[in-house]
């Protein structure tokens, strides 16, 4: 009897992925890496294959796709709503106040040097749920010694689900 994947271009090693609901080949992983890099500039390490499988397996279930190839074809057809969910699935939302503590004294020193010269705009490009921009705001208050500093902070994140929180 022929295997159900015979003739589908599924590598034998991928077929033997014991305990997995979906076949996930090295070619599928490379395709995911290429798509997420081209769409969002996210560079996935080759060591992230298991993480990618677990996060995208949920997307396959929710979109009723039987294979990663079918799911990736959906993206390639330009389904913008699914692209958003794809990106949200593959971003990591590690966040905390003053998460990279060595950056904040440098920011405070820089702010003190330019204090009074003009208004200051700060862009926090990976804001997650907000702890990073709040840490920046606390650093601004500490550097200027008041709450009326001429500073505006814009916070953004690729993951739209964390921005909604």
Question: Which residues make up each language-model segment?
Answer:
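Class I S-adenosyl-L-methionine-dependent methyltransferase module
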Residues: 118-165
């Amino acid at each position: 009897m022929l295997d159900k994947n015979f003739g589908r271009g599924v590598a034998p090693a991928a077929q033997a992925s014991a305990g997995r609901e979906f076949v996930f080949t090295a070619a599928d992983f490379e395709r995911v890496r290429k798509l997420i890099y081209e769409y969002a500039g996210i560079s996935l390490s080759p060591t992230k294959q298991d993480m990618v499988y677990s996060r995208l397996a949920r997307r396959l279930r929710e979109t009723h796709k039987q294979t990663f190839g079918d799911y990736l074809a959906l993206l390639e057809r330009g389904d913008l709503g699914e692209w958003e969910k794809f990106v949200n699935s593959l971003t990591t939302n590690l966040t905390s106040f003053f998460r990279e503590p060595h950056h904040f004294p440098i920011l405070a020193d820089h702010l003190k040097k330019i204090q009074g010269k003009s208004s200051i705009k700060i862009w926090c490009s990976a804001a997650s749920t907000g702890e990073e921009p709040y840490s920046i705001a606390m650093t601004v208050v500490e550097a200027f010694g008041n709450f009326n500093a001429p500073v505006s902070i814009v916070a953004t994140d690729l993951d739209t689900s964390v921005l909604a929180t």
